[in-house]
A protein has these predicted regions:
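M16 family metallopeptidases and their MPP-like homologs
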Residues: 50, 55-81, 95-140, 169-196, ...
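N-terminal secretory signal peptides that target proteins for export/translocation
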Residues: 1-8
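Active-site His/Glu-centered metal-binding helix of metallohydrolases
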Residues: 78-86, 301
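Short acidic-hydrophobic surface loop/beta-edge motif
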Residues: 37-42, 265-269
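Non-catalytic, conformational "gating/processing" segments within enzyme and secreted inhibitor domains
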Residues: 154, 204-239, 442-443
Length: 469
């Protein structure tokens, strides 16, 4: 698995919103527009409703435009810590009572923090939507950050970091790669935070984060499922409408400086096998120019390299030459910060990382000089569709793709229109982006140098109580 899956997963979810409709764009897009409604409350909160009446269920999500990229040095991880604290009680609820109320009606809830946002969701039978809105609106304005609860929860977060990062070689490499690839962009910091920052964090840091960013005018409410737009609007006005807007902190531009040479790092960590990852700075989709073709060409290139079992990387390096046990590619197509295009590989036994690098470069040169045939382009687009088509079967996935686009400054209204740009990608576009972006001056190479793996006692991997978010 590619160590850049965090970025890739976010990009894939967003890209899926566009690619899903490829096979039936003409007839499906207008219907989706009719089934999706948007309005804004007087306090600035945007509400988006997607009707899907196939089952009497609803996904209710609140997304805040506040993620790890908004943190300052010395307080990394506070966005994720606050996410944990959102389940630790309000003026009206005891710690843990929020989730108990959701479970009591047969629903499920959770939350997640990204570099660009923090999101909270519930999936419930449709008659319980009013109760979910009441609960979520309560903690938007009445969160109680107790000093004692914080002291316990910060220990949970630190243990989460130990288990999911410090004890996982691929996670360590990913963390170090991001820190090396980005110089001044906050994407260089891990979402979970640096351990020293967590050790020195106080409940006042979490409280300040809550006060700075958690407001209706910094949030988007997405409701998908068996609902009527008018009913959702009335409920949103009832529960979220009375919450006062806040003055949101100014977000200063944090544009990554131009890289001026290859960066290479070697990470020593307990592991069975070595691995090498190449990560190039790459453009993202800009809300101000959704028709710029390069991000779409890079997405198609990623699929050509690693979109199916017979893709170029797998066919040439794993099947034919047997140089690698695994190899994959990914590209972060969207986000508020700079993005990366990556290729990762684990060499087969007896094969060197140098040979892997040499052959990956040969594959890229071949694409740059010879291009891609029309049949391969068509096949990749078809495979992209087949891989994504089932996402719309889930009301949860529908809510996700809408919300992620909105968090990145792209209206859901343009998701299907953007598909036309995928169709426009030609072989010369792919050749151009390889030549323009996959260059050494924009490259960071991370090598995993495996160290002896220490055996752990039984139960050592057990997650601490409360590790859920």
């Amino acid at each position: 698995m590619n160590i850049l899956t965090t970025l890739a997963g976010r990009a894939l979810t967003f890209f899926g919103a566009a690619i899903i409709s490829f096979s039936g764009y003409a007839q499906n897009a207008p219907q989706k527009t009719l089934n999706t409604h948007e309005f804004q409350l007087s306090n600035g909160m945007k509400v988006i409703v997607r009707q899907d009446h196939r089952a009497p269920t609803v996904a209710h999500m609140v997304w805040y435009r506040a993620g790890s990229m908004d943190e300052v040095n010395g307080k990394t991880g506070v966005a994720h810590v606050l996410e944990h604290m959102m389940f630790k009680g309000t003026k009206n609820l005891k710690p843990g009572e929020f989730s108990k109320k959701v479970a009591a009606v047969g629903g499920r809830d959770n939350a997640f923090t990204g570099k660009d946002y923090t999101a909270y969701f519930q999936q419930i039978e449709k008659s319980h939507l009013p109760a979910m809105m009441a609960l979520e609106a309560d903690r938007m304005q009445n969160l109680r950050i107790d000093k004692e609860e914080f002291a316990k929860e910060i220990q949970v977060v630190m243990e989460e970091r130990r288990l999911r990062t410090d004890d996982q070689s691929k996670s360590i490499v990913y963390e170090q790669l991001m820190a090396a690839a980005f110089t001044n962009n906050p994407y260089r910091n891990p979402i979970i935070g640096w351990m020293d920052d967590l050790k020195n964090m106080t409940y006042l840091d979490a409280l300040q984060w809550y006060q700075d960013w958690y407001a209706p005018n910094n949030a988007v409410l997405v409701v998908t499922g068996d609902v009527m737009p008018g009913d959702v609007k009335a409920l949103a006005e009832k529960y979220y409408g009375p919450i006062p807007a806040k003055k949101i902190k100014e977000r200063k531009p944090q544009i990554e400086v131009t890289q001026i040479g290859t960066k290479r790092i070697v990470v020593k960590a307990p592991a069975e096998n070595p691995e090498i990852t190449f990560a190039w700075k790459a453009p993202k989709i800009e809300p101000s120019d959704l028709n710029a073709i390069d991000p779409y060409a890079l997405s198609v290139l990623s699929a050509i390299l690693d979109g199916h079992s017979n893709s170029r990387l797998n066919r040439l390096l794993v099947k034919d030459q047997r140089l690698a046990d695994s190899v994959d590619a990914s590209y972060g197509m969207s986000g508020r910060g700079s993005q990366l295009f990556s290729i990762s590989a684990s060499p087969a036994k007896g094969k060197s990382l140098a040979v892997i690098e040499e052959n990956i470069r040969k594959i890229l040169v071949d694409i740059k000089t010879k291009g891609v045939s029309n049949s391969e382009l068509d096949r990749v687009k078809t495979q992209l569709v087949s891989a994504q088509i089932y996402k719309r079967d889930s009301i949860f996935a529908q809510a996700m793709e809408i919300a992620i686009a909105e968090m990145n400054g792209i209206s859901w209204k343009y998701l299907d229109d953007m598909l036309l740009n995928v169709q426009k990608v030609k072989s010369e576009d792919i050749q151009r982006v390889v030549e323009k972006y996959l260059i050494d001056d924009a490259l960071t190479v991370a090598t995993l140098d495996p160290q002896a793996v220490q055996k752990k006692t039984a139960g050592a991997q057990a997650a601490p109580a409360g590790m859920r978010h």
